Swiss-Prot record:
It is a peripheral membrane protein. Coiled coil: none annotated. This is Phycobiliprotein ApcE. The gene is apcE. GO terms for cellular component: phycobilisome; plasma membrane-derived thylakoid membrane. PANTHER family: PHYCOBILIPROTEIN APCE, PHYCOBILISOME 32.1 KDA LINKER POLYPEPTIDE, PHYCOCYANIN-ASSOCIATED, ROD 2-RELATED. GO terms for molecular function: lyase activity.
Length: 896
């Protein structure tokens, strides 16, 4: 994998701590239910005690120095420890007429003799702060050193601050996250026993401020006890991400991140669970596999599988396997998607994560391509990773942020895959991103394709990712510059020719509006001189161009900056100053800065004021820094007061579009009405096929020669052939004509009535009455005694076959193979079988059907069949017994 690969820039906000309210709501949301009674009662208790906890935190904050000083005096000797305490910078409070205590009616439980002074020190000597560790020894300040003293006092202040935070939050999670594991860190610089003593001293000092309120004192003691226990606890081990594959990154998640994140409840199907607990486990499996509780949302369930897993007939692992193979899952998560996207969703549902690498995608893509959904499900469920994480009893869960360490190479895609809208995205994300690692950088913004505007007349339209999301992460580094197309002569681009920045584009670029040198507001600059080229004789035309350039449209009368317009017309300000005032106006601020995030606003302003897209991260980061430290107006001044603006536009020119992205140019060229005939036309050399070249005439031919050649080959007799087709038995004339045509085709002559015997009379009557069709009539003529006498008995079998194909198929035999086939039928089964094979064959049915009398077909393929058919028809029937088909001239003389 490329070391410069980008896994996307999806924004994630890790949870820094937990509160009971957030945890309860998160658990209810994960289980798709409302808050239970016990949870509501606990929330009620927390909210009711909120005022008291705020007052406790306020009291401890106001007396923090005294509390820390008392604890420091307990463990340090030989000086004043409090002088080493560095207080955090505090904002100056706003001046108000009355204090907040008098307005809110709050009561502060601080007492004048609570913790400081001489009596407070004596009280601390005789009061019990808890058991003192046996290894505790006071620390001399001079030997400890100023640096260590500052760190020690800072740690004491932090401990007190964490306690107040936890009291306000209503839960000890802040203390757990920030204190557990500090024991090993502090023991390198300070004694653990001394730290325990000072925490106990702060506990006693804080409790002394609430002697009048038992409930408040109990809360303070409770949280300090938690602080002590968490500090004494050993440092927990990091959570290591498991994975049997070599291409999966071995990552670790600190335990503090795991403790701070929202807990994801794990469900396991145990034999001893109650019916309600088993139902909860089954619903959790539905929520994981189908991303919703299908029994609650759609009143659907797979009852026979539920019964089996409840009774212990199948394990939860097998239950997950069968759910993923069910028709419901196939319909929702497999059939609507291509294989690569279905694979990504299957990873989410079964393993609780997205694909990790390209190699993993390739492996499972081959499985789903060869075996379909069942093979993919079996491969995932039977994997070693599934066994390590979930085993046989645990329901799969999402292993997202805070549950385990996340990989950077699929960061953005995995965060999107965990969202509820993942099934609505049809485009595969993982394989698309992995494939882009080895490809050139795309034509998009360095901070995401969602920042690329459509470069149309009314400005930049940034697409939202709510419908048909198209964001594509790309590994743009700080040295990458985008390729921009110059609107003007190519030799004048500012990258290859920096000295030509101030050159006007002419007819190849946008129209330039420049204040004429004779008008009051014109000033002579670097690229102006005394030339009046592109000069405007009317300041109103220039003002309209400035509005359109800066705002993208004409403004209403009430939105125009009339004062600035008058000053420009009077020559008090330059065009550059006029553009700056437009960009600093309230309308520009509301349109293009306030509604958008910084990256989008900077890109928009850059295209409006400097009239080109940004090059890369270096340029964007400079504007980011200015925007964060100085704000909107400083960004405007940085653009308009830049050297590039001065070189390109000077003091008297309205900014005009100088550069485009390739994508923007393509969108403009593809619009209806903007496509030119000489652009986008691909000129390909016409390649003449070989058979056409061979058929072309190489010399000039005269008309007599052409007439002579046109008479060769198949002559006009083919077009003059009369086809007899019997469509109705009621037309006796047509029946009679068809009968006579059949006689001429089969017997090669007309048969007079006195020759026709009773056999033919019966056939003609049946044909006239509709009892038989023309095909059966032809077959009856061929099997008659007259045909046998005239065309079978006097000739050898090969000659009989030639005449049979002539009479019944209208052609000569195709080749020796056909003669051999019919010869075998004729020799073994006789004339009737031979006639039946031809008349009932597929060739006869396709050519003549059941109602057409056979006729000469003038076949031209194969090439040798036409002359054979011609010779067969032109020769008299009983002229000789010479065969037609064996008349081919041999290529090699036999016996020569």
């Amino acid at each position: 994998m490329s070391v410069k690969a980008s896994g996307g820039s999806s924004l994630a906000r890790p949870q820094l701590y937990q509160t009971f309210a957030v945890s309860a709501i998160s658990q209810a949301e994960q289980q798709d239910r409302f808050l239970e009674g016990s949870e509501l009662n606990e929330l009620t208790r927390i909210f009711q005690s909120g005022s008291l906890r705020l007052e406790i935190a306020e009291t401890l904050t106001e007396n923090a120095d005294l509390i820390v000083s008392r604890a420091a005096n307990r463990i340090f000797t030989g000086g004043s420890p409090l002088s080493y305490l560095e207080k955090p910078v505090e904002r100056q409070p706003a001046l108000v007429g009355a204090s907040s205590d008098s307005r809110n009616g709050s009561v502060t439980y601080a007492e004048s003799n609570g913790g400081g002074g001489l009596f407070g020190g004596l009280r601390s000597v005789f009061s019990s702060t808890g058991p003192i560790p046996p290894g505790f020894r006071p620390i001399n300040i001079a030997r400890y050193g100023p640096s260590n003293m500052q760190k020690s006092l800072r740690d004491m202040s932090w401990f007190l601050r964490y306690t107040t935070y936890a009291i306000v939050a209503g839960g000890p999670n802040i203390i757990v996250v920030n204190t557990r594991g500090l024991k090993e860190v502090i023991e390198n610089a300070c004694s653990i026993d001394a730290t325990i003593v000072r925490i106990q001293e702060m506990r006693a000092a804080s409790a002394d401020y609430f002697r009048a309120n038992a409930q408040a004192k109990e809360i303070v003691l409770q949280y300090f006890d938690i602080l002590l226990s968490e500090f004494k606890a050993p440092t927990p081990a990091n959570k290591v991400r498991q994975g049997p594959s070599n291409d999966i990154q071995g990552l670790e998640l600190p335990q503090s991140y795991f403790n701070a994140s929202a807990k994801r409840q794990k469900y396991a199907m145990k034999p001893g669970l109650s019916a309600l607990e088993k139902n909860a486990v089954i619903k959790a499996a539905y929520r994981q596999i189908f991303e919703r509780d299908i029994t609650k949302a759609y009143s659907q369930s797979i009852s026979y599988l539920e019964s089996q897993v409840r009774n212990g007939d199948i394990s939860m692992k097998e239950f997950v396997r069968r759910l993923a193979k069910s028709p419901l899952y196939r319909k929702q998560f497999f059939e609507p998607f291509i294989n690569s996207r279905a694979l990504e969703l299957a990873f989410r549902h079964i393993l609780g994560r997205g694909p990790s690498s390209r190699e993993e995608v390739q492996k499972y893509f081959a499985i789903v391509s060869n075996g379909g959904l069942p093979a993919l499900v079996d491969a995932l469920v039977d994997s070693q990773e599934y066994s390590d994480y979930f085993g046989e009893e645990t329901v799969p869960y999402l292993r997202g942020l805070g549950v385990e360490a996340q990989e950077c190479r699929n960061w953005g895609m995995q965060q999107d895959l965990f969202s509820y809208s993942a099934p609505f995205r049809k485009v595969p994300q993982f394989i698309t991103t992995f494939a882009q690692y080895d490809r050139p950088l795309p034509d998009q913004h360095v901070y995401g394709s969602g920042n690329d505007p459509l470069e149309i007349q009314f400005g930049a339209i940034f697409p939202k990712e709510t419908r048909n999301p198209s964001k594509r992460p790309a590994p743009f580094n700080k040295d990458t510059k985008r390729i921009l197309i110059h609107r003007g002569p190519a030799v004048n681009n500012q990258v290859g020719n920096p000295s030509a920045v101030g050159e006007f584009p002419g007819s190849l670029g946008a129209k330039v509006f420049r204040l004429n040198g004779g008008l009051p507001g014109a000033k002579v600059g670097k690229n102006t001189g005394t030339s009046v080229k592109f000069g405007e004789s009317s300041t109103q035309a220039l003002i309209r161009a400035a509005y359109r350039q800066v705002f993208g449209r004409d403004l209403y009368e009430g939105q125009r900056l009339s004062v600035a317009e008058i000053q420009l017309e009077n020559g008090d300000i330059s065009v550059r100053e006029f553009i700056k005032r437009l960009a600093k106006s309230e309308l520009f601020l509301k349109l293009y800065w306030a509604p958008h995030y910084v990256c989008k606003a900077i890109e928009y302003m850059h295209r409006r004021l400097l009239n080109r897209p940004t090059y890369g991260r270096q340029e964007m980061n400079q504007y980011f820094d200015i925007a964060s430290k100085q704000g909107f107006y400083a960004v405007v001044e940085a653009m308009i007061d830049s050297k590039e603006y001065s070189d390109a536009f000077g003091e008297d020119t309205v900014p005009y579009e100088r550069y485009l992205t390739p994508g923007g140019l393509q969108m403009r060229s593809a619009r209806v009405g903007s496509i030119r005939e000489d652009i986008g036309q691909r000129v390909d050399k016409e390649v003449t096929p070989r058979f056409v070249e061979l058929g072309q005439v190489s010399n000039l031919r005269t008309e007599p020669e052409i007439a002579y050649r046109s008479n060769q080959g198949v002559y006009r007799q083919r077009q003059q052939t009369k086809v007899f087709k019997l469509t109705s038995n009621y037309d006796k004339v047509a029946v009679k004509n068809a009968i006579r045509a059949a006689h001429r085709q089969v017997f090669e002559r007309d048969l007079e009535p006195y020759i026709i015997n009773s056999e033919f009379t019966a056939l003609e009557s049946k044909l006239s009455n509709g009892e038989i069709n023309v095909k059966e009539f032809i077959e009856g003529l061929g099997t008659s005694e007259l045909y046998m006498k005239e065309f079978y008995a006097p000739y050898p079998n090969t000659k009989v076959i030639e005449m049979g194909t002539k009479h019944f198929l209208g052609r000569a035999p195709l080749n020796q193979k056909e003669i051999q086939q019919y010869n075998q039928i004729l020799a073994s089964q006789g004339l009737k079988a031979f006639i039946g094979a031809m008349v009932n064959g597929m060739e006869y049915l396709q050519t003549f059907g059941e109602d057409t009398v056979p006729y000469r077909r003038f076949p031209t393929l194969p090439a040798a069949n036409f002359p054979n058919t011609e010779r067969l028809y032109n020769k008299l029937t009983k002229q000789d017994k010479e065969l037609v088909v064996p008349s081919f001239t041999p290529v090699v003389k036999v016996g020569g």
